[in-house]
Swiss-Prot record:
Gene Ontology molecular function terms on file: glycine hydroxymethyltransferase activity; pyridoxal phosphate binding
Enzyme class: transferase
Signal peptide: none
Primary role: Catalyzes the reversible interconversion of serine and glycine with tetrahydrofolate (THF) serving as the one-carbon carrier. This reaction serves as the major source of one-carbon groups required for the biosynthesis of purines, thymidylate, methionine, and other important biomolecules. Also exhibits THF-independent aldolase activity toward beta-hydroxyamino acids, producing glycine and aldehydes, via a retro-aldol mechanism.
GO cellular component: cytosol
Designated name of the protein: Serine hydroxymethyltransferase
Organism whose genome encodes this protein: Helicobacter pylori (strain P12)
Site (Plays an important role in substrate specificity): H225
UniProt-annotated binding residues for (6S)-5,6,7,8-tetrahydrofolate: L118, G122, H123, L124, E242, S350, P351, F352
GO biological process terms held by the UniProt record: glycine biosynthetic process from serine; tetrahydrofolate interconversion
EC code: 2.1.2.1
InterPro entries associated with the record: PyrdxlP-dep_Trfase, PyrdxlP-dep_Trfase_major, PyrdxlP-dep_Trfase_small, Ser_HO-MeTrfase, Ser_HO-MeTrfase-like, Ser_HO-MeTrfase_PLP_BS, SHMT-like_dom
Entry's family note: Belongs to the SHMT family.
């Protein structure tokens, strides 16, 4: 197949092809990454990238929006159907943009946010001091207990002391299910709004493999990739008409200008895929595969944060190991397994080194790998970590896993 890009910019084309090979030959196990649908990539690469459309359907500041109005309206309706809610904003460029828009809509400068501590699994936008949310608002955090679980009684005590305007329940590295009902009870107790950030588990939520944030959360944010397998982007949902109006104003003109219509079309395509029965089977596989991996690692005496997992990810704990999360990340990468170093509860090393790694099952499940493959992968991870400086072992395992990966091809071309 001939590509314009190959003729006009061979340098970039060759690098894309190099990444294409890496994605096919490596085992992608970063919990926030996934393989999107080819149809989504076709929409992303369409002529819709040419169209500016500031505003919302039938309320644009530019002409010529008749077609993109239909596209955005379709994306909104599909999102509402998928998440069983009354209002959806599909314009947020990312999950971080979605969260920032929620704060912009519902808070005043220096209002109080209560979110999960970064080292316990929270996200930068949940109030981390280095982020905009930690600078523009007063941020406070809750963590996990010694077992690695959220202690809801402790969250209540902190909320009663802090009296936040908004409580964020959600995570970027927490291996257990969120109890939205308990969080709502805490929010009601202190008069706070509740934001459910389901960026990581949205695909599980819509497939009934994780508790649903509605009717408990006042507003819900998400990404459209990760477990949803859609394009990179953000999404905001609510059942409250007043909140919905504030969200729309906070996105445009509050925090963004023109929406990315090619991305919104791709979101619509992704939502249609999510509504299919096959997607429920996929989400079930994501969870069951992670259970297999956790079991394999525990049988090899590896320590997991919270002792296991209830979703699509797990965290390995190296607090009592001579090697760090960074060491493990590099060693596994050399063996063809892509993970990421991650801070864990009780962290003693710097965020650039860490005492843990985060591992996810969504991407390999999208390739069709099942229990057999995940058991093999668990054993290989164990072998590498138990002899972490053995470079020849890493290279040997890399070839073994490359052969396995080739049995489950991702895509048959690098550009759609």
């Amino acid at each position: 197949m001939a590509y314009f890009l190959e003729q006009t910019d061979s340098e970039i084309f060759e690098l894309i092809f190099e990444e294409y090979k890496r994605q096919n030959e490596h085992l992608e196990m970063i919990a926030s990454e996934n393989y999107t649908f080819p149809s989504v990539m076709e929409a992303m690469g369409s002529i819709l990238t040419n169209k500016y459309a500031e505003g919302y359907p039938n309320k644009r500041y530019y002409g010529g929006c008749e077609v993109v109005d239909k596209i955005e309206s379709l994306a909104i309706e599909r999102a509402k159907k998928l998440f069983n809610c009354q209002f959806a904003n599909v314009q947020a460029h990312s999950g971080s943009q979605a969260n920032n828009a929620v704060y912009h809509a519902l808070l005043k400068p220096y209002d109080k946010i209560l979110g999960m501590d970064l080292s316990c699994g929270g996200h930068l936008t949940h109030g981390a001091k280095v982020s905009l949310t930690g600078k523009h608002y007063q941020s406070f955090s809750y963590g996990v207990n010694l077992d690695g679980y959220i202690d809801y009684e402790e969250v209540l005590k902190i909320a009663q002391s802090v009296k936040p305007e908004i409580i964020v329940c959600g995570f970027s590295a927490y291996p257990r299910e969120i109890d939205f009902k308990k969080f709502r009870e805490i929010a009601d107790e202190v008069g706070a709004l509740l934001l459910g950030d389901i960026a990581h588990v949205a695909g599980l939520v819509v497939a009934n493999e994780h508790a649903h944030p509605f009717p408990h959360c006042h507003v819900v944010s998400s990404t459209t990739h990760k477990t949803l397998r859609g394009p990179r982007g953000g999404l905001i949902l609510t059942n409250d008409e007043e909140i919905a109006a504030k969200i729309d104003k906070a996105i445009f003109p509050g925090t963004q200008g023109g929406p990315l219509m090619h991305a919104i079309a791709a979101k619509a395509v992704g939502f249609k895929e999510n509504l299919k029965p096959e997607f429920k089977a996929y989400a079930k596989l994501v969870k069951s595969n992670m259970q297999v991996l956790a079991k394999a690692l525990k049988e090899k005496n590896h320590k997991l944060v919270s002792g296991g997992t209830s979703n699509h990810l797990l965290l390995m704990d190296f607090l009592d190991k001579p090697y760090s999360g960074k060491d493990a990340d590099i060693a596994l990468g050399n063996a063809g397994i892509t993970v990421n170093k991650n801070t864990i509860p009780g962290e003693t090393r710097s965020p650039f080194v860490t005492s843990g790694i985060r591992i996810g099952s969504a991407a390999l499940s999208a390739r069709g790998m099942g229990a057999k493959e995940f058991e093999i992968i668990g054993n290989k991870i164990s072998d590498i970590l138990n002899d972490i400086n053995n470079v020849s072992l890493q290279l040997h395992v890399k070839e073994e896993l490359k052969a396995m990966a080739n049995q489950f091809p991702v895509y048959h071309q690098p550009i759609f």
